[in-house]
Every structure is written in C-alpha cells, then in structure tokens.
Design a protein with these regions (language model features):
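Non-catalytic substrate-recognition and accessory regions of acyl/acetyltransferase enzymes
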Residues: 1-103, 111, 115-137, 142-181
Length: 181
C-alpha cells in the first residue's frame, strides 16, 4: 500500500470507490478532491496502484473559544488547526485488521488516520498548529473517539466548519497528544 497525494493521474480510479457514504464518495469523485481551495487530498492505493483503498483530505483552520458577553458572541482564538475534511476506507476494506500491537488491533482506518497525523506533525514544524479537528459520521465515531483519543468539541468551542452533512460529531485532538509528538 502507498499513500500519495491525489492527482488527476488517479482520477479514473475513483469510479470504483465506495465507502458507503454518498457525500464522502462524491467529494472524491466530483473533482473537488483536486481543488486546492478545498484542501489537499491523499489516497491510499493498492500495491499495484490500480485501486483506491481509502483517502483523506486536509486543510487548515483555527479553533476559537466562544465567549458570550451580553447578547454578543466573541470568538477568542485557541490555536491553529488542521481539519480532516474527509477520511474514508472503501467498504470492501472496512474493518480489515492490519496488525496487532500490545493487544490492540490496528485496522486500515487506524493506519490511514496515523498517516494523516504524521503529516500534521510534519506541517507543525513550519506553521502553528495546536489541534486536529474533524466532523465524524456516526459510523466513524468509534474509530476517532474510542480508538484514537479524539474528544467531542466543548460547547464553547468553534471552528467555523460548515458541512452539508450536519448529522456528524465535531471532534478534536491536541497535536501534542499525537503519539510521537
């Protein structure tokens, strides 16, 4: 498996990608995944580079603390963030165990998330990043919250991410909490 930056070269491979979520599939297939204004997309390819196993898309942002003064909301910056806009594994490979480490099973979803977190650590050397943020689907919540220590946004936190699928969970992780930081 290889995880590489998504380019037009791989666009024909998106036809077979299906993670079970229309919005997440459509982002990859529509061409938005190639739009740098929408973030940078990375794909997990088969060894033969002829199949997309999974992908993620990241962009930068900021996490603010909301303070209510009278009738006004004031936004106090808490720190820069890398937003995981999308992260998905093809439905044929979901729940595929790759390894076991200290009694903990490691799945493809954990593997691609770890690659994303390593990329965040690399970016942190050049730009201010305090958080990794994401909007999780109900199906993905277990991967992030329970298996990889992402926390639910507090009521007084905001990152201004607007998603057309508002049924998800807003989660964050301090970059300092990424193993290997």
């Amino acid at each position: 498996m290889n995880i590489v930056k998504y380019t037009k070269r791989f666009s024909s491979l998106t036809e077979k990608f299906d993670c079970g979520n229309f919005i997440i599939n459509n982002f990859l297939k529509s061409g938005d995944a190639l739009d740098k204004n929408q973030g940078i997309t990375y794909v997990m390819l088969s060894d033969e580079k002829n199949y997309i196993i999974g992908y993620y898309n990241i962009s930068v942002g900021r996490v603010d603390q909301i303070e209510i003064v009278g009738n006004e909301k004031l936004y106090k910056p808490m720190g820069g963030s890398v937003n995981i806009n999308f992260l998905a594994i093809h439905s044929e490979f979901q729940r595929t165990q790759m390894a076991e480490f200290n009694g903990r099973k490691v799945y493809l979803g954990d593997y691609i998330l770890r690659d994303c977190e390593k990329r965040v650590l690399g970016l942190r050397k050049n730009i201010g990043i305090a958080f990794v943020t994401l909007n999780s689907t109900q199906e993905g919540y277990h991967l992030y919250h329970e298996r990889n220590s992402y926390e639910d946004f507090d009521e007084d936190m905001s990152n201004f991410v607007q998603d057309s699928d508002n049924s998800g969970y807003k989660l964050y992780k301090w970059v300092d909490d990424i193993i290997g930081a």
